[in-house]
Each structure stands twice: as C-alpha cells, then as structure tokens.
C-alpha cells in the first residue's frame, strides 16, 4: 500500500537543513494537514532557518572555489593526456572495417614414433614367415626316448 502524498519523498532544493540533519518534518504516517500545494514541501523552524542561512554563505564560496580548482585540474589533465596518448588519425593507421580472419589456434604437434619401433613394425608387416615346428617338438618329448620312465603324479 502506497502513500498518496508525494511530499514525503520530495524536498525543497533551498532547504538544506533536512538533508544535513537527516530527518524530515513530516508526520510518521506521511499524512499532512496542509491543503495548499505550495506548502507541500517541508517547513523549517526559524532556529534551523538561521543556521541554514549561515551555512549557505560559506558553502556557496566553497563551491565556487571548488569549481575553479576543478576547471584548472581538468585543463591540466587534458594537456597531460595530449602529451602522452593520441588517437591515430591518418588513413593508413586506422583499422579496416572488414574484420580479419584469425588463423587457427596452435595445436600440439603429433609425436613421432622412435626408429626402433618403426624398424620392428616394418619387418613384421612385410615379412611373415610361418614355421611348423610340431614334428621337432614331438621328437623332443617322444615317450620311447624316455624309456618308459614317465611316472604319474599322485594327487592327495
């Protein structure tokens, strides 16, 4: 639920007392008994009005001094910037409107296999010799040559 009176959110630009002291002179519920639209702004008591008038004079002098100092510092900063960095204005220094195509990202080179593996693999792939050595193996383990001394193992 909102308030119908916008006066609690607005402040008079000439009234510095409420911003300095940090409080408003409105009722806490936001309703005002005033019916005049010009008096919707906050009312300052006479004590605060005197303080406000005294405070305004030094502040106006300070703001004028600050603006003069700021103007001087801005001019100095502009001069310093002109000395150091300048935007290129020649036609050969200006970047082209067409974006350049970037080269592909660098990749890790493939590992070269060692020569010893290369030699071994090349012989295997090119020369495949199939040997049948079953007869030689049978001759080595022939039961007649062992003189029937083969004993069977006993299982426990």
Curated annotation (Swiss-Prot):
Region (Disordered): 52-90
Coiled-coil annotated residue ranges, if any: none
Keyword Membrane appears in the UniProt entry: no
Species this protein is from: Arabidopsis thaliana (Mouse-ear cress)
Function: Probable cyclin-dependent protein kinase (CDK) inhibitor that functions as a repressor of mitosis in the endoreduplication cell cycle.
This protein's record includes keyword Metal-binding: no
Keywords per UniProt: Cell cycle, Protein kinase inhibitor
MF-aspect GO terms: protein kinase inhibitor activity
Domain of life of the organism encoding this protein: Eukaryota
Sequence ranges of Basic and acidic residues compositional bias: 67-77
Name of the featured protein: Cyclin-dependent protein kinase inhibitor SMR10
